[in-house]
């Protein structure tokens, strides 16, 4: 009876560890995929949005301090 209990405890711990490592991997890839989708969804920044890494849309000018300019 004691051996069966030990085997069950080890099996539960192993399955829990497998689920945790799988969940971490999925979340990691989801974050990368999400940031790529956001980056690809906007080709220019609208009025009031940052223009440090993305150019302003037509008719807007990038103005402001070097650390955080915005499109006006």
Swiss-Prot record:
GO cellular component labels: extracellular region
Q: Give any Pfam family that matches.
A: Conotoxin
**Prodomain residues:** 24-42
Keywords tagged on the record: Disulfide bond, Knottin, Neurotoxin, Secreted, Signal, Toxin
**Tissue and organ distribution:** Expressed by the venom duct.
Disulfide bond entries: 44-57, 51-62, 56-71
Q: List the Gene Ontology MF annotations in alphabetical order.
A: ion channel inhibitor activity; toxin activity
Its localization reads: Secreted
Coarsely, its chief localization is secreted
Q: Which domain of life is it from?
A: Eukaryota
Q: Does the keyword Membrane apply?
A: no
Signal peptide per UniProt? 1-23
Note what the entry says on domains.
The presence of a 'disulfide through disulfide knot' structurally defines this protein as a knottin. The cysteine framework is VI/VII (C-C-CC-C-C).
Which family, according to UniProt?
Belongs to the conotoxin O1 superfamily.
Protein's name in the database: Conotoxin VnMKLT2-011
């Amino acid at each position: 009876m004691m051996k069966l209990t030990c085997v069950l405890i080890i099996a539960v711990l192993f399955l829990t560890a497998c689920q945790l490592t799988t969940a971490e991997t999925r979340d990691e890839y989801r974050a990368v995929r999400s940031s790529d989708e956001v980056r690809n969804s906007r080709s220019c920044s609208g009025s009031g949005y940052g223009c440090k890494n993305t150019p302003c849309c037509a008719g807007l000018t990038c103005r402001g301090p070097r650390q955080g300019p915005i499109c006006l």
